[in-house]
Amino acid sequence: MGRRPARCYRYCKNKPYPKSRFCRGVPDPKIRIFDLGRKKAKVDEFPLCAHMVSDEYEQLSSEALEAARICANKYMVKTCGKDGFHIRVRLHPFHVIRINKMLSCAGADRLQTGMRGAFGKPQGTVARVHIGQVIMSVRTKAQNKEHVIEALRRAKFKFPGRQKIHVSKKYGFTKFNTCDFDNMLAEKRLIPDGCGVKYIPSRGPLSRWKALHAN
């Protein structure tokens, strides 16, 4: 018996139902890798960031997330090289979906109880996504802008509903605007830390501030 189509589980009807000691025997999600590309690239190497944003309140299956990840990665590797980008899938499939299996063979009415005791067995996992929530983000060099938009456009076809592609005003995966980022870095208010930055507030011990600016 094949997998039930994901259109049956598209809408968020019930409360979140995660894997727990009460909900056991859940199959592993199809998506296992959430960061790919050159994920150890420093923050200043990939200034451009683009997001795929959901326009609907719905559920996305782990199979769809994996298919979109593969699709975007394949196009970006072909156009920008395997070290020219960093993709991050921002959704994790924690919600467990159930199926109440029905027999369709001869004499099935003797074996099954129909809708009596209809609480189903775990079938798979989905991610619940809200309107305006980011599904997938890509950071890369500024000259690859068109390639990023095309990669996300292709990945959109793996999902139901409507998604929008948004080119961010922020610098890479940080929360700071591109126009302010270089100035804050020069003033040592930001310190690069992997693919992100540490923000140094303007208050605290004077000795720490002097030690920071002495370097």
From Swiss-Prot:
InterPro entries registered for this protein in UniProt:
Ribosomal_uL16, Ribosomal_uL16_CS_euk_arc, Ribosomal_uL16_dom, Ribosomal_uL16_euk_arch, Ribosomal_uL16_sf
**Cited Pfam families:** Ribosomal_L16
Gene Ontology molecular function, alphabetical? structural constituent of ribosome; translation regulator activity
Assigned keywords, A-Z: Cytoplasm, Developmental protein, Ribonucleoprotein, Ribosomal protein
Gene3D superfamilies registered for this protein in UniProt:
3.30.60.300, Ribosomal protein L10e/L16
Identify one Gene Ontology CC term for this UniProt entry.
cytosolic large ribosomal subunit
According to its UniProt entry, what is the function of this protein? Answer: Component of the large ribosomal subunit. Plays a role in the formation of actively translating ribosomes. Plays a role in the embryonic brain development.
Membership in a protein family:
Belongs to the universal ribosomal protein uL16 family.
Could you describe the subunit structure of this protein? Component of the large ribosomal subunit.
Recorded protein name is: Large ribosomal subunit protein uL16
Tell me what organism the protein belongs to.
Answer: Danio rerio
Q: Please name the gene that encodes this protein.
A: rpl10
